[in-house]
Design a protein with these regions (language model features):
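Short hydrophobic-aromatic micro-motifs
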Residues: 105-108, 141-144, 343-346, 381-384
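Ordered, small/hydrophobic-rich secondary-structure cores
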Residues: 1, 145-148, 156-157, 163-165, ...
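A short beta-sheet element
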Residues: 131-132, 145-184, 346, 384-425
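Short, surface-exposed loop/turn microsegments at beta-strand edges and helix-strand junctions
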Residues: 96-104, 113-116, 120-122, 134-136, ...
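Non-catalytic DNA-recognition/assembly elements of restriction-modification systems
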Residues: 1-93, 221-331, 463-505
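A short glycine-rich beta-alpha junction/loop motif
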Residues: 161-169, 201-223, 402-409, 440-465
Length: 505
């Protein structure tokens, strides 16, 4: 450094300006809210010394507190002062299933949520059990006790004296208004949470009748119970009227086509008395299908029977019948909360009036797919196409704007004057084999939209009868919507009762 030069120190001050991060607009980027609660030592001991949080349901604990702090007070369902007169399940027994429709129709627990319950099995009269003890009676409450606990249904006239599986809880009440009142409670989120846990909030996977002694319910005056009960019973009566109209429509269809009983339609085997089905198919009839189930003779016999008295037998893909058959593509789903999505459910809940376990698809991420493939419209026909093939449902008004998953195809009718007729045919026992014959897949059964479009559908000579069939089904579908509104009216009133907290709480 030269003589006389000075050292100069330069100081630089840097101002830090924090970057303002924009709050995430989509709720899917937000962390899941933390759930927490306290559990006493006594609760842990009663729950088998379980220390893992998954063994306890925090929401169920909160639900219990809510009911017990209700302004009306509470009462346990079962007990000396409870609402239930009797609750029981049947005795276990070895079932002898048959394929003979003349045997005893047998309903399974999974059937009780269906808007039109139909027996899916038959058991032999030789079954070693007291069949009469399995019959249900009018104004019983039925409840599933395992699997999905707490599914409920009310027995009305159509199901009176029907034989149900032993593993359903049958409940009778002391007062007639308690039936609809308890049903409404069990169809609220609070009621279901309490039922699916024990009295300490521990998670359970099976219930017995005595479990109901630990289920509290608001102890409202009879006037309130009566209002809720009447709405629920009216809902169930509307369902029965709806099913009566569908029966009437389908009977008109069968009579006009002069169809024999489906159980009498049998195909001929190439060689009888061999113990298995065997038949001959011409090469020009193979239709590129070498699987025997596609060519079962019963299918051809059904088509022959239908063709005899029909004006014409066309296919579901005919543009006079449907404007579009939609098979949604598979996709990775992004679920959000109720306020930011569209209701989304699957084929398992297809036959329910009000599907349970509904999730919500993100509108932000799936808008195009929802609008073009998934969205439901009133009077569409929904057909399951994966797993259990051929379950049919006509879309009611309250499902409009909801979505179904890719395991259910949508048949969009050409117009309103054919929409109900499509359902009347597809939901018949004559159409089901025509759908199922198209099944393919080694592990999971599947059919696609092209195959569904080839399913035969008859057009009637008498167009007035065909129109009447259509109108009866559409009227039935409207009654289902009214039944839904009545049930929701009762459930909403029940929720208001549950939310009415005592000032002393």
């Amino acid at each position: 450094m030269e003589k006389g030069a000075r050292n100069i120190m330069v100081s630089v001050a840097l101002k830090y300006e924090p970057l303002e991060l924009e709050a995430p607009k989509s709720p899917i980027f937000l962390p899941t809210p933390l759930k927490y609660g306290s559990v006493s030592i006594a609760q842990m001991v009663s729950n088998g010394h379980r220390y893992d949080a998954s063994a306890y349901n925090i929401e169920a604990m909160n639900a219990l507190r809510k009911v017990k702090r209700n302004k009306y007070g509470y009462i346990d369902l079962l007990g000396k002062n409870g609402l239930i007169n009797n609750a029981f399940v049947g005795n276990r027994f070895k079932r002898i299933y048959t394929e003979n429709y003349k045997d005893i129709p047998f309903f399974l627990p999974s059937d009780i949520e269906n808007i039109y319950p139909k027996a899916t099995k038959y058991i032999s009269a030789k079954t070693n059990t007291d069949i009469d003890s399995l019959k249900v009676k009018t104004d019983m409450l039925l409840m599933s006790v395992s699997g999905t606990i707490g599914k409920t249904a009310i027995v009305r006239q159509r199901l009176n004296d029907c034989v149900f599986s032993h593993d359903l809880l049958r409940i009778d009440f002391k007062d007639k208004y308690d039936l609809g009142y308890v049903y409404a409670f069990m169809n609220t989120k609070v009621g279901l949470l309490i039922l699916q846990s024990n009295n300490y909030g521990a998670v359970i996977d099976h219930i017995e009748p005595e479990h109901l002694a630990n289920v509290p319910i608001p102890n409202v005056p009879n006037e309130l119970k009566k209002v809720i009960h009447n709405s629920i019973i009216e809902s169930y009566d509307l369902r029965d009227k709806s099913n009566d109209l569908i029966d009437e429509a389908q009977n008109l269809l069968y009579n006009e086509l002069q169809l024999p009983d489906i159980n009498t339609i049998k195909g001929e085997n190439y060689a009888e008395n061999k113990g298995f089905k065997n038949y001959v198919i011409k090469v020009n009839q193979l239709n590129d299908r070498l699987d025997g189930s596609y060519h079962i003779p019963e299918v051809e016999e059904i088509i022959k029977a239908v063709s005899k008295n029909a004006a014409e037998v066309t296919t579901l893909g005919d543009n006079r019948i449907s404007s579009k058959i939609i098979l949604p593509e598979r996709f990775k789903r992004i679920y959000v909360d109720k306020d930011h999505g569209v209701p989304f459910f699957g084929g398992k809940q297809l036959l329910s009036l009000n599907p349970t376990n509904v999730k919500y698809l993100s509108l932000i991420h799936h808008r195009n797919r929802i609008e073009n493939q998934l969205l439901l419209e009133k009077n569409m026909c929904a057909v399951t196409c994966s797993g259990t093939i051929g379950k049919i449902m006509i879309v009611p008004q309250h499902w409009e704007g909801w979505t179904l998953n890719q395991h259910v195809m949508r048949v969009k009718p050409a117009n309103e004057s054919i929409a109900g007729y499509i359902y009347a045919w597809l939901d018949s026992p004559y159409a089901k084999p025509l759908i199922i014959r198209n099944t393919y897949g080694a592990v999971v059964d599947e059919i696609d939209d092209n195959q569904l479009s080839t399913v035969a559908i008859p057009l009637l000579k008498n167009k007035q009868v065909q129109q009447k069939i259509n109108d009866l089904v559409l009227e039935a579908n409207e009654l289902r919507y009214q039944a839904y509104l009545k049930e929701q009216e009762a459930i909403n009133q029940m929720n208001k009762i549950i939310d009415a907290t005592s000032l002393m709480a």
